[in-house]
Each structure stands twice: as structure tokens, then as C-alpha cells.
Amino acid sequence: MKLSTKVTELTNIIAPAVAACDVALWGIEFAPQGNRSLLRIYIEALPEEQAQNKQVTIENCAAVNHQVSGILEVHDPIAGEFILEVSSPGFDRAFFSDEQMHAYVGQTVSLRLIQAIGEGDKKRRKATGTLNSIDGTSLKLTATDGEQFEIALSNIDKANLIYEDA
């Protein structure tokens, strides 16, 4: 889940504007698309508000959109036109850093890997299962078929939480 140089640059510019709106920055997706790019910002309630079961509102998203639009006009880090979207990460949230996954140990995640794992004809570049543990270099996953994996964090291209209705 290595962030691109452009996403890192945008994060450094955008993070203070998001914080000024009293919400937390969950992550940023940037997709250049010819002469029009897409910038998607995910925000979530601050930890102390989450403890009170407060969620991101449409008003939070509108405030962040307004603040970030102004900052981007000043810094102009995106060539050409762009579409700005602001939303919560949702139930099936993407993880943008290894640290974000710690709070979801015991839950189901979906991983897209850089290099295949497994043996023989069971090799796979995608794995879905229960996140058993995570440390500084790897995570342990019990796949939905019961197979156990230890996966290097550096081998994860993309990770998402799988929402399961309780």
C-alpha cells in the first residue's frame, strides 16, 4: 500500500485543511484521466467523536470540499481540470496505510497482492479472510477456505474491509 509521490504531495497540502474542519483524513485517491483528473478524499469522524458513535455528515463533506478547493486553488498541484469528491470511507473502506488495519483485527478483509502467495495450483494474488494479527512487517490471515497465510505488508497492493452485517 505504498502511496504515490503525487498522493503524498496532495496529502501534505490537504491534511491541514481537513483538520481545520474537525474531521480526520482517512485517505486520498488520485486518478489522472487525460486532461481531467479525479481527486477523491475520504474523511472520518475524530476518534473522540467515534467513541460517541458520531459519524461523518454531508455537512462535514461540504465543509472539507470548500476548504480543500480553496487550498488547491492557491497551491495548484494538479495540472488541468479535476473533479473533487469528498466522502466517508464507508463500510467497505479501503486501507491507505498498514496502521489503519490494526483497529480491524478479527474482521474480514480483502487483499490484492503484488506477488502471488500459496503453493502450486492454489497460488493467488487475491485473498479474502479474517485478519488475525498485524505487526510492523506482516499480517496473518485465515482465508475463507481455511488456509492460513502470513503476508508481508510490502506485498499488499490494495486492502479493503469487507462489511458483514451483524
UniProtKB/Swiss-Prot annotation:
Protein's GO biological process: ribosomal small subunit assembly; translation
Annotated function: Required for maturation of 30S ribosomal subunits.
Protein name: Ribosome maturation factor RimP
Lineage top rank: taxon: Bacteria
Predominant location category: cytoplasm
HAMAP family found in the cross-reference section: RimP (MF_01077)
Assigned protein family: Belongs to the RimP family.
Keyword S-adenosyl-L-methionine: no
Spans traversing the lipid bilayer: none
Subcellular location: Cytoplasm
Keywords: Cytoplasm, Ribosome biogenesis
Underlying gene: rimP
Gene Ontology CC: cytosol
